[in-house]
UniProtKB/Swiss-Prot annotation:
Function per UniProt: Required for transport from the ER to the Golgi complex.
Ranges of the Cytoplasmic topological domain: 1-192
GO molecular function: SNAP receptor activity
UniProt keywords, alphabetically: Coiled coil, Endoplasmic reticulum, ER-Golgi transport, Golgi apparatus, Membrane, Protein transport, Transmembrane, Transmembrane helix, Transport
Domain v-SNARE coiled-coil homology: residue ranges: 132-192
Biological processes, Gene Ontology terms: endoplasmic reticulum to Golgi vesicle-mediated transport; intracellular protein transport; retrograde vesicle-mediated transport, Golgi to endoplasmic reticulum; vesicle fusion with Golgi apparatus
Source species taxonomy: Eukaryota, Fungi, Dikarya, Ascomycota, Saccharomycotina
CDD domains referenced in this protein's UniProt entry, alphabetically: Longin (cd14824), R-SNARE_SEC22 (cd15866)
Topological domains, Vesicular: 214
Coiled-coil ranges (or none): none
Domain Longin positions: 6-117
Membrane topology: Single-pass type IV membrane protein
The organism of origin for this protein: Eremothecium gossypii (strain ATCC 10895 / CBS 109.51 / FGSC 9923 / NRRL Y-1056)
One GO cellular component term noted in the UniProt record for this chain: Golgi membrane
Name by which UniProt lists this protein: Protein transport protein SEC22
């Protein structure tokens, strides 16, 4: 179940937060962790990730200097969580354009957006429609490729969300290895295919030369 939604500017300014009926102290603690997490972002941080935190999971998406975060109960389908965030992001961008970048913007300046958050959360929490949404989005979101980390490691053990440069370097290295292997395989294949033909051709030329010039 979706528990809470938070929208921040990537410099830490809170733009909007859902008004939640749940007064569980553990949920309030998750929101505090979110604020600390936002302060740890760097330009190299992953643009989307899942963070495990006790009985909850936090999913976030960074887009155009805005971070969209949803806190859900453990076990809530991850593809639905990211589909929900996509809906939230599209509506927020459509409703406010680039207003959030203005220096005069105050904290929670877009609190009226909670109306959309509440309606959309209700849809995604409805068991009768979750099955259809899950099936609809299963092929649209490559959630298996989204990084998953434990938030305690990020906040207290020095782990980082900055995987992008490491991932790019790894992909480049793997690409080089693959290219070298592919070149060797192609060369070996050509050799096995044409070496006998070349040898026969050379033998034939030698035979002609020997018969003509002996």
């Amino acid at each position: 179940m979706i528990k809470s939604t938070l929208i921040f500017r990537d410099d830490g300014l809170p733009l909007c937060s859902s008004v939640d009926d749940d007064t569980d102290p553990s949920l309030a603690d998750q929101k505090k962790k979110v604020k600390v997490l936002i302060s740890r972002f760097t330009p190299q941080s992953a643009n989307e990730a899942t963070l495990e935190s006790g009985a909850y999971e936090m999913h976030y998406v960074r887009q155009q200097s805005v971070v969209y975060i949803v806190i859900v109960e453990r076990g809530y389908p991850r593809n639905l969580a990211f589909a929900y965030l996509a809906d939230v992001r599209h509506e927020f961008e459509h409703s406010y354009g680039n207003e959030y970048v203005k220096p005069s913007v105050r904290p929670y300046a877009f609190v009226s957006f909670d109306n959309f958050l509440q309606k959309t959360k209700k849809i995604y929490n409805d068991k009768r429609v979750q099955g259809n949404l899950d099936q609809l989005n299963s092929d649209l979101l490559g959630v298996k490729q989204i990084m998953t980390k434990n938030i305690e490691d990020l906040l207290y053990r020095g782990d980082s969300l900055d995987r992008m440069s490491d991932l790019s370097a790894s992909l480049r290295q793997d690409s080089k290895k693959y290219r070298r292997s592919a070149q060797k395989i192609n060369f070996d294949l050509l050799l096995s295919q044409y070496a006998p033909v070349a040898l026969i051709g050379l033998f034939f030329l030698f035979l002609v030369w020997w018969l003509v010039f002996r």
